[in-house]
Amino acid sequence: MSTWLLPENIADVLPSEARKIEELRRRLLDRFRSYGYEMVMPPLLEYLESLLTSGGNELRLRTFKLVDQVSGRTLGLRADMTPQVARIDAHLLNRQGVTRLCYAGPVLHTRPRGLHASREQLQIGAEIYGHAGLEADQEIQQLMLDALHLTGLKKIRLDLCHAGVLAALFARDAAAAERGEALYEALAGKDVPRLNELTDDLGADTRAALRALPRLYGDASVLDDARRQLPALPEIARALDDLAHLAAQVKDAEVAIDLADLRGYAYHSGAMFAAYVDGVPNAVAHGGRYDHVGQAYGRARPATGFSLDLREIARISPVEARGAAILAPWKQDDALRAAVGALRDAGEVVIQALPGHDHVLDEFACDRALVERDGAWVIEPR
C-alpha cells in the first residue's frame, strides 16, 4: 500500500483551504466574544466513560476507542465537544449564574455522518448554562444565524423541532418508551414503513401521534396542525408554544417546523434546531437544549447551544480568503530588513522572493511591491 494514502473520509487541509478555515474561525470566535462567550479548550482524548455520559448509542458508535498504555483504562477520541464543555461548566468552573462558553477544535468519527462528510471535523460552537428560559434558546438561535451569515451563506433555512413532544408520548405510553431507540431512528430517518411496523400494536392515540410526526413539516402554520393531531398533553402544548415563540423571533432566515427532525434526541431536552442551505444535503449547523447532560458530572444545569463543522462551512462558503501581500526582493540590506520588519509589525504580509523564484507568488495576491527609490524603500502598486 502506498505510504501517502490516507484512510477513507480523512483528508489533508491544504494552504488555500486552511487559510479559509482560519479566516472563518477567527470571524466566528470574534463574534462569539462580542456576545460575551469565553473560550475553553477541552482535551482531544478522555476516559471513555466521561465522553459517553450522554448521546446514547449513536455517540458510542461514532467514538474511536483505544487502551491507555499508562493506566490500562479505555480512552476515547472525542466525537462531540458538547459533553466536554458541559463537564467543564459543571465540575471545573462550578459557577452559580449564567455561563457562556465557546470552543473550536477537531473531533473524530468512526463513520462519516453524511454524504461526502469527513470523519475528522473541525467543530466550533457556543453554549449557555444556567438559564432555563426561552431567552437562552433565542440567543443561541440568533448567534447561530449570525455566525452563518458571517460565513457568507445565503438563503438559510432554520428547521425547528422539540424533544418534549416525543418525550411526552413516551412518558404516557410505556410500550412506546420500551422501543424508543427504534422509534427515534425511524422518525429521524422518516422511515414511514418501519414506523408503521413499530406502532402497529400501540394504543390508538399514541400510534396516531407517532405516525403524524413525519407529516408535521412546513411553515409555522404546521404548529396549528400539530395542536389538532397530537394528544392534548400539557408537555406537548408547552413544546409547541416554545416553537411558536422561537419561530416568531427569526427575521433573517426561512423557518420550517419539522417535528420528526430528531437529530441528537438522545441528549436533547427541549427546543432543537438545524440550519440548511440550498445544494447541501446535510444540516450545516445544529443545536438545542440539553438540560440534563451535566448531571453525570455531579451538577445538572439548564443548557442550550449549537455547533457546526468549519471544514464543511469553508467548502461551501463564498468568503474569499486570499490575502493581499507585498512582494519584496531578497537582498542583504539593513534598510530593506528594517522596512520589511516595520511592515510586518504593522500587520502587513510581506513575501520576500528568494533568488531565482521572483515569479512564484504562491497563493497570495501580491498587489504591491517594496522597491528602492533614491536610497529609500517604498511601496508601489504592482
Curated annotation (Swiss-Prot):
<comment type="similarity">
    <text>Belongs to the class-II aminoacyl-tRNA synthetase family. HisZ subfamily.</text>
</comment>
<dbReference type="InterPro" id="IPR004517">
    <property type="entry name" value="HisZ"/>
</dbReference>
<dbReference type="GO" id="GO:0004821">
    <property type="term" value="F:histidine-tRNA ligase activity"/>
</dbReference>
<keyword id="KW-0368">Histidine biosynthesis</keyword>
<comment type="subunit">
    <text>Heteromultimer composed of HisG and HisZ subunits.</text>
</comment>
<comment type="function">
    <text>Required for the first step of histidine biosynthesis. May allow the feedback regulation of ATP phosphoribosyltransferase activity by histidine.</text>
</comment>
<keyword id="KW-0963">Cytoplasm</keyword>
<dbReference type="GO" id="GO:0005737">
    <property type="term" value="C:cytoplasm"/>
</dbReference>
<dbReference type="InterPro" id="IPR004516">
    <property type="entry name" value="HisRS/HisZ"/>
</dbReference>
<keyword id="KW-0028">Amino-acid biosynthesis</keyword>
<dbReference type="GO" id="GO:0000105">
    <property type="term" value="P:L-histidine biosynthetic process"/>
</dbReference>
<protein>
    <recommendedName>
        <fullName>ATP phosphoribosyltransferase regulatory subunit</fullName>
    </recommendedName>
</protein>
<comment type="pathway">
    <text>Amino-acid biosynthesis; L-histidine biosynthesis; L-histidine from 5-phospho-alpha-D-ribose 1-diphosphate: step 1/9.</text>
</comment>
<dbReference type="InterPro" id="IPR041715">
    <property type="entry name" value="HisRS-like_core"/>
</dbReference>
<dbReference type="Pfam" id="PF13393">
    <property type="entry name" value="tRNA-synt_His"/>
</dbReference>
<dbReference type="InterPro" id="IPR045864">
    <property type="entry name" value="aa-tRNA-synth_II/BPL/LPL"/>
</dbReference>
<dbReference type="GO" id="GO:0006427">
    <property type="term" value="P:histidyl-tRNA aminoacylation"/>
</dbReference>
